[in-house]
A protein has these predicted regions:
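Non-catalytic, peripheral interaction segments enriched in hydrophobic/basic residues
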Residues: 125-126, 157-162, 166-168, 191-311
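Conserved pre-catalytic core of RNA-dependent polymerases
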Residues: 1-96
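Charged boundary/loop elements
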Residues: 1-45, 136, 159, 249, ...
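Catalytic palm subdomain of template-directed nucleic-acid polymerases
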Residues: 29-46, 121-150, 168, 201-204
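Short, conserved micro-motifs composed of acidic
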Residues: 71, 155-190
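Active-site palm subdomain of RNA-directed nucleic acid polymerases
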Residues: 93-125, 129-131
Length: 345
């Protein structure tokens, strides 16, 4: 859903002849650097009941750790930073710790006007993306992130953080003003990965389709090696779980026919690899026999699922988006309608 909103925002600005300057910031081990004292102070300032704060304080202050090396263990030690990896409360505590950064970015009133709301960043856990129609605005947003990181022990890795210009026109990177964070100049790239989805500077989806194709082949070969003795029912279940759930496939709308044909072949071949079938066997027959969805059915199912989630969402930005002309002019929405209501394949 977050990637959908981000790409729709970029498409809207490109369609209106404007560029978009984006920075993907990589926070190095952000969950491990949460300062406990500052976290508890934020909880108190937000009005969290004092007994809950005391429970969390006691829980984090009294926990002890040890390091295992082969059959030996180190002495127990305590830590003063970080939230527990995999803990139920950890994502919520981290959101509280980082929420003031979102507030500070919104106070700048710099960014993009979209569905009646000024937007300049999107954050999911420690994955942060800031954007602005101008380089000057992007530099102010990046400086705000750097200042907050220095105040609350969040270090942004300049080597893994990148900038990108979303535009239909080719641009010379040398003529674009640099973006600096922690005295390091961030490089400009033509594509980057955000939340596992590859975003290209011209918003084409060929690179992300290629990524998914590699994942399908890798999963199929791994399953074929490990579960070659299982029966067909188990193999089909594994195929549906690992090869059938194609991440962000519902967001593909600008791609070459060759790219789509390549991933269709990969999808069909992965089923043959897992079931040890002949490369020449009919794809439609093997899917019908094993009650498995074809590639086009998978795409339509993922589109319908995302569309239902979008219409049922109570998030204010999605509600505004559904009631604006942007929704009806979106190329992605038109592609969805063609896929759901035109049964040519």
């Amino acid at each position: 859903m977050l990637i959908f909103l981000l790409k729709e925002l970029f498409r809207h600005y490109i369609a209106n002849g404007s560029s978009m300057y984006v920075t993907m910031l990589d926070a190095s081990k952000a969950f491990d650097k949460v300062n406990h004292s500052k976290l508890f102070t934020k909880l108190i300032d937000r009005g969290c009941p004092s007994f809950i704060v005391r429970i969390l304080y006691y829980w984090y202050r009294t926990q002890k750790f040890t390091v295992r090396w082969c059959c030996s263990f180190s002495e127990f030690f305590t830590v003063s930073n970080g939230v527990k990896q995999g803990g139920i409360l950890s994502p919520h505590l981290f959101n509280v710790y980082m929420d003031d950064l979102s507030v500070n970015l919104n106070k700048l009133q710099i960014g993009c006007l979209y569905a009646g709301t000024i937007m300049n960043h999107m954050m999911y856990a420690d994955d942060l993306c800031v954007f602005s129609p101008s380089v000057a605005g992007l530099r102010k947003l990046t400086d705000c992130c750097a200042k907050y990181g220095n105040m609350f022990d969040i270090t942004y890795n300049a080597k893994k953080s990148v900038c990108m210009v979303i535009d239909n026109k080719p641009r010379d990177k040398k003529n674009i003003h640099p973006v600096v964070i922690n005295n390091h100049t961030l490089p400009y790239t033509e594509k980057c990965k955000y939340l596992g989805h590859i975003i290209n500077n011209n918003l084409t989806d060929d690179d992300d389709i290629a990524r998914q194709k590699r994942c399908i082949y890798a999963q199929a070969n791994a399953l074929a090696r490990k579960f070659y003795l299982c029966n067909n029912s188990i193999k089909t279940t594994l195929f549906n779980s690992y090869c059938g759930s194609m991440y962000t496939s519902s967001l593909w709308c600008h791609f070459k026919k060759q790219s789509l044909k390549g991933i269709t072949v990969a999808y069909n071949n992965s089923f043959r690899i897992i079931h040890n079938l002949s490369p020449r066997c009919s794809a439609s027959h093997m899917f019908a026999t094993n009650y498995v969805k074809s590639f086009n059915e998978r795409i339509r199912s993922s589109i319908f699922s995302l569309l239902c989630r979008l219409e049922k969402s109570d998030y204010i930005l999605f509600v505004k988006y559904l009631h604006t002309f942007i929704y009806y002019q979106s190329p992605l929405i038109k592609h969805w309608i063609d896929q759901l209501y035109a049964f040519n394949s």
